[in-house]
């Protein structure tokens, strides 16, 4: 694929993720949008790593590191959301006032 096509795909994914993160009122949806943003960044890392110097794997290694961070976020995030749901009976972001108490 050409570089422009991959970058446009990544920009679309990033834009959808940012839009969803800004407009989301549900914590689960916000976590999913955050994953979209991280995947768009990974696509950019791998694309630029392959385009500029395919012999060095710096972009690929950094992408694997971001995937590991995203896996930890995907494991811890729903646990935090379920804990908030048990205590507050809601997963809406605007109803979470945990720092006010």
Swiss-Prot record:
Q: Which GO terms describe its molecular function?
A: oxidoreductase activity, acting on NAD(P)H, quinone or similar compound as acceptor; quinone binding
Keyword Chloroplast (UniProt): yes
Provide the assembly information.
NDH is composed of at least 16 different subunits, 5 of which are encoded in the nucleus.
Which ranges does the record mark as transmembrane? 2-22, 32-52, 61-81
Species of origin reads Morus indica (Mulberry)
* Keywords attached to this entry: Chloroplast, Membrane, NAD, NADP, Plastid, Plastoquinone, Quinone, Thylakoid, Translocase, Transmembrane, Transmembrane helix, Transport
Q: Which family does it belong to?
A: Belongs to the complex I subunit 4L family.
One Pfam family recorded for the sequence:
Oxidored_q2
Per the record, membrane topology reads: Multi-pass membrane protein
| Keyword Hydrolase annotated | no
Q: Which GO terms describe its biological process?
A: ATP synthesis coupled electron transport; photosynthesis, light reaction
| Superkingdom assignment | Eukaryota
The record's annotation in NCBIfam families points to:
PRK05715.1-2 (NF004320), PRK05715.1-4 (NF004322), PRK05715.1-5 (NF004323)
Q: Where in the cell is it found?
A: Plastid, Chloroplast thylakoid membrane
Report the EC number(s), separated by commas if there are several.
7.1.1.-
Q: Can you quote a single GO CC term?
A: chloroplast thylakoid membrane
Catalytic activity annotation = a plastoquinone + NADH + (n+1) H(+)(in) = a plastoquinol + NAD(+) + n H(+)(out); a plastoquinone + NADPH + (n+1) H(+)(in) = a plastoquinol + NADP(+) + n H(+)(out)
Q: What is its main location?
A: plastid
State its role.
NDH shuttles electrons from NAD(P)H:plastoquinone, via FMN and iron-sulfur (Fe-S) centers, to quinones in the photosynthetic chain and possibly in a chloroplast respiratory chain. The immediate electron acceptor for the enzyme in this species is believed to be plastoquinone. Couples the redox reaction to proton translocation, and thus conserves the redox energy in a proton gradient.
The protein's name is: NAD(P)H-quinone oxidoreductase subunit 4L, chloroplastic
């Amino acid at each position: 694929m050409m570089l422009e096509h991959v970058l446009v795909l990544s920009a679309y994914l990033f834009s959808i993720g940012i839009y969803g993160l800004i407009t989301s009122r549900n914590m689960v949806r916000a976590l999913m949008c955050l994953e979209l943003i991280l995947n768009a960044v990974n696509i950019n890392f791998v694309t630029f790593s392959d385009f500029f110097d395919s012999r060095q794997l710096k972009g690929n290694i950094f992408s694997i590191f971001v995937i590991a961070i995203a896996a930890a976020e995907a494991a811890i995030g729903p646990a935090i959301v379920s804990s908030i749901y048990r205590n507050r009976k809601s997963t809406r972001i605007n109803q979470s006032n945990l720092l006010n108490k």
